[in-house]
Amino acid sequence: DAIKNDYPELRIIIASPQGITFNHNKAVELSREERRLVFLCGHYEGIDERVRLGFGAEEISIGDYILTGGELPAMVIIDAAVRLIPGVLGDEDSARHDSFADFILDYPQYTRPPDYKGMNVPEVLLSGNHEEIRKWRRMQAIKNTYYKRPDLLEKMKLTDEDKKILNEVKKKA
């Protein structure tokens, strides 16, 4: 009761396998929350039901598996939300272009050297042609999503270019 009296504008979240499944949209919602967020983390047996009911806490799950406590799920939720707050990341474009920001997986990443044990960086990435690099990256991202997480394609807002790419990927499948 003291907490409710001192901080009436709290949003209380319990990391729980009984909650709604956490996703990028929930991270965006939490990143824009103006109230203070409080995460309650049970350990082994969870949290007394009266706490959930008394505080009107919402439950959020990070997946269908069991951990020893709610600390790790709370950290996952916090990290995913905080990185979306302007000014937190050094590069504002990072959060916008990461996987799931628009329901598409990322394209493959390459670093130096250009040849590692016979595995080469794709020529297009070494070409310096920014438009071709952009097209290659988009093609690879759509291809990754199609093969690894096709469920995300249903949520994606496909441009005309994306639709053409997806059709090409499907033909080659």
Predicted regions and their residues:
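Alpha-helical scaffold segments in soluble metabolic enzymes
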Residues: A2, V76, A80, K135
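Short, well-ordered secondary-structure micro-motifs
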Residues: H24-K26, R50-R52, P108
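Short glycine/serine/threonine-biased micro-segments
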Residues: L40, Y44, S61, I85, ...
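Structured adenosyl-cofactor binding patch, chiefly the S-adenosyl-L-methionine
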Residues: I47, V51-D98
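Internal, active-site/partner-interface "lid" segment
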Residues: L72, L84-E123
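SAM-dependent methyltransferases
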Residues: P114-A173
